[in-house]
Regions:
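Bacterial N-terminal signal peptides that target proteins for export
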Residues: 1-8
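C-terminal motif of bacterial Sec signal peptides marking the signal peptidase cleavage site
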Residues: 17-19
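Bacterial signal peptide processing site
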Residues: 21-23
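Electron-transfer interface patches adjacent to heme c in soluble/periplasmic c-type cytochromes
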Residues: 29-61, 71-147, 157-158, 183-283
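Short, charged low-complexity linear segments at domain edges
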Residues: 51-68, 158-178
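Hydrophobic, well-structured mid-protein blocks that either form specific transmembrane helices
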Residues: 148-152, 165
């Protein structure tokens, strides 16, 4: 069977499952109170379905495109990204995302994978940072960033999450992320902790990991970026966080802003020791 057709069948099947189990758009998302899931529950069925199709993750297509973009000379300077230093030396992608976010001396900043790739695209290839930041997801050069993210994170799959807060700026970013995680506000008086600070919570049929604990943080951080079946595309962590802000009815965060990187630092460091399973496959 043609691989594209197989992917189409997988996507359609999962989309149908989602349509049958999701409320209408007019319903506001609510975190269900902790409850014991019965044997053979829909949650268990979804878990089995994910395991069944794990070898056919459509994120593989983004990964292949990202590898090509990484190696191809592009931009005003017509150079590739193969000299981009993601923290383990110029051009090294193996294991890089497992140790991000981290402090980079050349920018004097803590950066996540996406902000670091933007730095490389600006410095090495000559692109305009503002054009990437304001482009929107899946648009312009931001789309290239997303594809390269898929390529890079796939090269850490199976490795342990190993994020440091030894540098003062890393520690500062971690504390900012923790504060942001528990900050409560907006018209719904929500925070990240409203959904992700207790065990046993669910929204619709989706289990909500407790990000304040190592196991939950590893599940949350370790499986993103991921292919999102319900939307039919690949979501980076920046996009995942952007959608969390939307669900809380907060203003949309600026792409690769300090606050989004800080939240990533908090989640990643809390999940240290867990396994990187990216790119994941999500509802």
């Amino acid at each position: 069977m043609d691989k594209r057709i197989a992917y189409g069948i997988v996507i359609a099947s999962f989309a149908f499952l989602q349509a049958c189990t999701s409320p209408t758009k007019s319903e506001a998302p609510k975190a269900a109170a902790p409850a014991a899931a019965p044997s053979g529950s829909a949650t268990d069925e979804i878990a089995r379905y994910r395991a069944m199709i794990a070898d056919g993750n459509p994120a593989d297509l983004y990964e292949a495109a990202g590898e090509e973009i990484w190696k191809k000379p592009m931009g005003p300077k017509n150079v590739s990204l193969q000299k981009c230093d993601l923290g383990k030396g110029p051009g090294v992608v193996k294991g890089a995302s497992a140790e991000l976010p981290r402090y980079f001396k050349d920018t004097n900043k803590v950066q996540d994978l996406e902000s670091r790739l933007v730095t490389c695209m600006v410095r090495l290839q000559g692109y305009d940072a503002n054009e990437i930041i304001t482009a929107g997801f899946e648009k312009g050069k931001r789309k290239d960033v997303e594809a390269v993210v898929a390529y890079v994170v796939a090269n850490s799959k199976g490795m342990p999450i190993k994020v440091s807060i030894k540098h003062p700026k890393e520690k500062e970013m971690y504390e900012l992320g923790k504060k942001s995680f528990f900050f409560q506000g907006g018209p719904m008086d929500f925070s990240c902790a409203s959904c992700h600070a207790e065990n046993g919570k669910r929204i619709r049929l989706q289990d909500l990991p407790n990000i304040t604990e190592q196991k939950g943080a590893a599940l949350g951080w370790g499986y993103w970026p991921a292919y999102r079946v319900s939307s039919g595309n690949f979501w980076t962590m920046q996009r995942r966080l952007n959608d969390c802000y939307r669900q809380q009815r907060f203003p949309e965060p600026v792409y690769i802003s300090d606050n989004t990187i800080a939240l990533s630092m908090y989640m990643a460091y809390t999940g240290n020791g867990g396994t990187v399973e990216t790119p994941g496959l999500k509802r």
